[in-house]
Amino acid sequence: MSDILFVSIGAILGANIRFQIHHKLGNLNLDKGFLILIINTFASFGLGLFLSLVEQFRAFTYSYQLILFFSIGFFGSLSTFSSFVYDLFDLCLQLELFRALKLFIISVSIGIIAFAFGLFLGTQ
């Protein structure tokens, strides 16, 4: 099977799960930036956990395709970087520079922590 197909199937699943999470949490009337933070944190954690477990798949014939499926396809599509950037840009246009900076710092920091925590859990 083509590598592109593995990435594509993972992306379809990731995008649909992102849509479902956004839809379900959107009913709670949370701030849009906070929703994006939750989804991106979940994706960062999942990617970290997956990458820490990759070594177990090395002996599997399709290990490279699994990496493509999950890391680029699924988790790449699940995260919402473009929405994150749009929110930052929108805050800057509204001259809410402190809120934009706060959103940037919190989102990147929590994303790195979630990724590292996923890596840590996968090695335990």
Swiss-Prot record:
Main localization (coarse): membrane
Keyword flag Metal-binding: yes
GO molecular function: fluoride channel activity; metal ion binding
Reaction equations catalysed: fluoride(in) = fluoride(out)
Cellular component GO terms held in the UniProt record: plasma membrane
Localization annotation: Cell inner membrane
Regulation of activity: Na(+) is not transported, but it plays an essential structural role and its presence is essential for fluoride channel function.
Residues that hold Na(+) according to the record: 76, 79
Transmembrane segments: 1-21, 34-54, 66-86, 103-123
GO biological process, one term: cellular detoxification of fluoride
Keywords noted in UniProt: Cell inner membrane, Cell membrane, Ion channel, Ion transport, Membrane, Metal-binding, Sodium, Transmembrane, Transmembrane helix, Transport
Membrane topology listed for this record: Multi-pass membrane protein
Cited InterPro entries: FluC
Keyword Metal-binding: yes
HAMAP family, A to Z: FluC (MF_00454)
Free-text function comment from the UniProt entry: Fluoride-specific ion channel. Important for reducing fluoride concentration in the cell, thus reducing its toxicity.
Family listed: Belongs to the fluoride channel Fluc/FEX (TC 1.A.43) family.
Designated name of the protein: Fluoride-specific ion channel FluC 2
